[in-house]
């Protein structure tokens, strides 16, 4: 079982590493490519667009051909794209490389969740996804630090060579350690069960909405945090970095505690707790009389996301034993596109950073609480504890 957990964690971590590691080198990249930092900030959106594009087909291919035939090309593409970015001499070529990086990371991301659905029952999967969420929270803190240390001695291109090295590690794991987990091709008698695994299932759609809103909350916080903490609250850059590191610490602590909480409380209880924390955070930020209270509200955001997201993802994947890849893709596309759409619309309408965060917190909590309370899970699908190997 450990091989599947190690491979899944490695496959997922390409996604945040591709986002966070290069940011520290952005000023030098812009200077070398004769572009402004503002022009290259679009590289974040281009990377997410690549991920979303990969998710359109990766899940279906993973369900038809297997997990490895998607993971291996995905890791290989991430390696090639990282090298391409390091060799880029214009901003257009750099952005093209970032799109290809997103494609590779998106393929790996989809496969990771499909593998966990294949190999773990509902309760164990919720625990593992919570742990995975905690590990993912480390990357936004460690990646810029690692990038800074690399750039003390080497040029910015070394950041992408480091990403390529990470991709090589994932490729080796996918080639030599990962075993195929896709369930055997459905027989005629399995067709009714396959057809019953509809993406229009009310329970699945409710979890898509809940996880998309939750991701929108955390990405809105990440996007608005420089404005909130430095421009509005007046913290210096060093203090901002410290606060963000502390919020990551809160996220990790709660994420690593959630598996133990699942041994005591029902998943539904933790999901309700998550949304109550979001609601409390929104109200706290709305009425906050001081910076200290506002910072407390921010910690509630991190705790709320960490306690509920892994559980909600596990529940979303639960109904799909034969279409786990497609379900994973659907979740990823909804989360990437939904959160990006909200942030873009809020900016176009002219909603301030503070109100943008408060608005999504309150909307997420109210909608999600209603869905949790009124949309019950259907008949549970048998878990795939036994791995099906293919010749």
Swiss-Prot record:
A Gene Ontology cellular-component term: plasma membrane
Keywords: Antibiotic resistance, Cell inner membrane, Cell membrane, Membrane, Transmembrane, Transmembrane helix, Transport
Residue stretches spanning the membrane: 4-24, 42-62, 69-89, 93-113, 131-151, 158-178, 203-222, 245-265, 269-289, 293-313, 331-351, 356-376
GO biological process: response to antibiotic
UniProt keyword ATP-binding present: no
Membrane topology listed for this record: Multi-pass membrane protein
Pfam families in alphabetical order: MFS_1
GO MF term set: transmembrane transporter activity
Keyword Cell inner membrane attached: yes
CDD domains: MFS_MdfA_MDR_like
Principal subcellular localization: membrane
Protein location: Cell inner membrane
Superkingdom classification of source: Bacteria
Matching InterPro entries: MFS (IPR011701), MFS_dom (IPR020846), MFS_Efflux_Transporters (IPR050189), MFS_trans_sf (IPR036259), Multidrug-R_MdtL (IPR023697)
UniProt xrefs under Gene3D superfamilies: Multidrug resistance protein D
Function comment: Confers resistance to chloramphenicol.
Record family assignment: Belongs to the major facilitator superfamily. DHA1 family. MdtL (TC 2.A.1.2.22) subfamily.
Name of the protein this chain belongs to: Multidrug resistance protein MdtL
Organism, scientific name: Escherichia coli O127:H6 (strain E2348/69 / EPEC)
